[in-house]
Amino acid sequence: EISACLVGSEMCIRDRGLIDGPSTYNSISNYFHQDLRLNCGSYGFEAPIQVWTQGTAKDIWTCLGPIWRGINSMKKVTIDGEEKLRGGSLVEASYMSAFRLGTYIATQFKPNVAKAIYHMTNAKKVLDTSCGWGDRLAGFFASDAEEYYGCDPNPNTYARYNEQISKYNKLLSKPKKVTIWRCGAEDLPYHKLPQIDCAFTSPPYFSTEEYNKGGELEENQSWFKFNE
């Protein structure tokens, strides 16, 4: 268990540890953002959608090949003195695993971990300065926190946040308050924020993921603005 307390202006942490939450509930935010996430490549590898729509036959086969071979349950067997791979089954996990081998898939932040952070801090008003794929937003709605403030410069995810908020609030007896600005943390109007109980985020991977590359307002992304 991890607990934290604020002493003066310094945060002290007791019982340092790791919040080891499962990825079981990733789908509650991924439902709204998966197509955008699968179109976000990195500096070294293209995203699945990029490979599928723009890649060569060889690029696409790099992904389809493992599916064809049934990557999840292949076994090494000896045939005529030679070791070969045989067997394999085509199950749902095969598809994602295969594309992970041939492309780059932007990672999610586990919503249940965000929920745990808000719970540990007894937060009612939370700040997320990099809303990303809506994972911490999902964690907020599952928590006892009441107000969520955040920002993200990506116009595509910004539009999805509105869908996400509307859908979640329809499931609650009392809608929660959410305010998100379409900008980076460096341009967030901090003077408009109330007293925040918990400021918690997952900053962009500057040297890894290229968010909204080639899209509208690409120039507002951190990897573009602060590229060295």
What do the PLM-derived regions correspond to, one by one?
Residues R16-S94:
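Non-catalytic substrate-recognition/targeting regions of SAM-dependent transferases
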Residues F99-N112:
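Conserved SAM-binding loop and adjacent beta-strand
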Residues K75-L90, N169-P175, L217-F224:
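Intrinsically disordered, low-complexity coil segments
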Residues V113-Y190, C198:
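Conserved S-adenosyl-L-methionine
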Residues I2-I13:
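Short, small-residue-biased leader/transition segments that mark boundaries at the very start
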